[in-house]
Design a protein with these regions (language model features):
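Mature catalytic domains of secreted/periplasmic carbohydrate-active enzymes
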Residues: 1-272
Length: 272
């Protein structure tokens, strides 16, 4: 139902999957004597327990198959827990299952986070935004509140903060994956809803400068970011505070040629 609700709004689906699973005993055994072995998991050394690890690999691959074949079209699968990787002695043989499910989902991207290689099709900086545009596809994953999970009385970013964050990412060529931890009853917290609705209202007016755009030099300079689409260049100036002064005239540091300047919302020519 969740996936279908997003699809009805024209939003593509990227399914989240944690490669680590502390709820299955083939990964985490409560009675394991770990000694000095203090990694985030598994609770045993795979090289010392190959049969147990193979049980976990089978379980994990079956879950990936289920996600990729039972819920309609997926644009991407987003794999968390980067320490579960061959380089760390925790090989779930992701390549073989991804190649298998891509026969069903031929256009599906794969984000094997922080692992690198052919199955990290885009990188996912966490809780940060790169200073400059990157030469590879990227998507910042950032919490709307202070935690990836739900917290009572959490403090959420204001609509203005989220809008400034989104603009900063898009002008550098990235996407924003914004995290909202649902309440125990499954609902989205009211504070998060207010922030997202505020961003939605802004996008309803200014989304033309965001959706489907590409980066445009000088990307971001003197507080103004640039995007481009369909022969148009968009200059985006954001203000982190309601009290920041707004000048009557704005210097736009764009070196390319242009014929006219239009205010996006008012569709009115500006003098320049």
């Amino acid at each position: 139902h969740l996936f279908e609700s997003f699809r009805k709004r024209g939003i593509g689906i990227a399914a989240y999957f944690s490669k680590a699973d502390w709820h299955v005993d083939s990964y985490w055994k409560d009675d394991t004597k770990r000694g000095k072995f203090k990694s985030r998991g598994p609770s045993y050394r795979p090289e010392e327990n190959p049969e147990e690890w193979e049980r976990f690999v089978t379980f994990t691959q079956n879950q990936i198959r289920e996600l990729a074949t039972g819920y309609g079209r997926l644009e991407a699968m987003w794999f968390d827990a980067g320490w579960v990787c061959p380089q760390n002695g925790q090989d779930i043989r992701l390549a073989e299952v991804i190649e298998e499910v891509r026969k069903v989902q031929p256009g599906m991207l794969c984000a094997d986070r922080t692992v690198g290689g052919p199955y990290e099709n885009y990188v996912t900086p966490e809780q940060c935004v790169p200073e400059k545009p990157m030469t590879i596809p990227w998507e910042s994953c950032i919490t709307l509140g202070t935690s990836f999970s739900f917290k009572y009385e959490d403090v959420y970013k204001s609509p203005r903060e989220v809008i400034c964050l989104l603009a900063d990412i898009v002008v550098k060529g990235g996407n924003l994956a914004i995290n909202v931890g649902p309440q125990p009853d499954g609902r989205i917290p009211a504070g998060a809803v207010a922030s997202l609705k505020g961003m939605g209202e802004w996008l309803a007016e200014y989304g033309e400068a965001i959706y489907g755009t590409r980066i445009c030099a000088p990307y971001k300079k003197d507080g103004i970011g640039f995007t481009q689409k369909d022969g148009k260049v968009y200059a985006i100036q954001t203000f982190l505070s309601e009290t920041e002064p707004v000048e009557d005239e704005v210097w736009i540091p764009y070196a390319g040629e242009f014929r006219e300047v239009t205010a996006l919302v008012y569709d009115k020519l500006q003098s320049f």
